[in-house]
């Protein structure tokens, strides 16, 4: 990499792109980028670092730039076309990240669900114990030139994680998602097998996932979970309204009892994966326990605030399995309150392909409210609607619009769980504005 060049990020507000931009900035590289003008939660960190954010415009491009192209954009994007026409070096996000890993003990976190939460937890724990660079999918990134560890989120979309050859990899689960790219579950499984073959030292995988049990590769695969056949087993689990406690057993030996101020079974599993990695890197597990206790979570993952006499939870969940996990966590922390799911379906292809799963998982809430479907940069229309999903759920499921929140405006002493990967926060802000 060249410190005389300026690294120009096309799509700098993207969750991974903003994280990578922050890492390069921390390591002393010159960084700027472009994106849509609409405010996104990721730009706060970029602005705090003094990184210039420009509106998309081919005129932004000039000699001396190294262009980092966001994976959300095709080669037909006007800025990418202009960069290539000018002869500028153009690197895709995942390619640059892959090039950076060799300097560290690198630990990737892959999985259809739970990547960001687990990456954030691992980064927090290791940062408290040794120098650690990290890239988290919530727009958070930190670069330390002489770091021991590099923790990063490895995205399976379009097989982008094939660019990575890490020392270790955590695999949280394998599920069918991204139906605009993957044909079926077997197609997703083949991608995870491919990246497993590129790991140098070891893989830590959730033991109850049938797809992950099929992984067959040259490095050891250590399974974690709650069953006796798992290499790292969580036992004597206690889930309360303040968090969870559990023992960790490895090869018949109790490694310790651990406490987390987090909710939901998935956070016990995420913590178990982190403990397993720390164990193999010979990190003091008493210190790991102390770091686990101070973890507050990542952005847009079960973020809570009080609004009037209600609790508002903001979460990125946009797949049936994630919705189930988020509602499970809400039930654990607030067992005596009404749970209201406010969900923004994300992409038409995913909504159509996983319709039955969405209906089943959302039905775990006491009440369901839907917004219109959020399209994407790749897909802005489809033959399915939120009303189709509402009809599938039944149980008086309602639809809301940003200027008509009547379905939720009169709720009292309830927990409103806003979920989605699009712009669901605009509905949250409109709701909060009712009480100002």
UniProtKB/Swiss-Prot annotation:
Record keywords: ATP-binding, Cell cycle, Cell division, Cell shape, Cell wall biogenesis/degradation, Cytoplasm, Ligase, Nucleotide-binding, Peptidoglycan synthesis
Listed GO MF terms: ATP binding; UDP-N-acetylmuramate-L-alanine ligase activity
Binding residues annotated for ATP, in chain numbering: 111-117
Compartment(s) where it occurs, according to its Swiss-Prot or TrEMBL record: Cytoplasm
Swiss-Prot/TrEMBL catalytic activity: UDP-N-acetyl-alpha-D-muramate + L-alanine + ATP = UDP-N-acetyl-alpha-D-muramoyl-L-alanine + ADP + phosphate + H(+)
Any one annotated GO CC term: cytoplasm
Swiss-Prot/TrEMBL GO biological process terms: cell division; cell wall organization; peptidoglycan biosynthetic process; regulation of cell shape
Coarse class of the protein's main subcellular location: cytoplasm
Listed pathway(s): Cell wall biogenesis; peptidoglycan biosynthesis
Enzyme class: ligase
Coiled-coil blocks: none
EC number annotated for this UniProt entry: 6.3.2.8
UniProt similarity note: Belongs to the MurCDEF family.
Function text: Cell wall formation.
NCBIfam families given in the database record: murC (TIGR01082)
Protein's UniProt name: UDP-N-acetylmuramate--L-alanine ligase
Upper classification of the organism: Bacteria, Bacillati, Bacillota, Bacilli, Lactobacillales
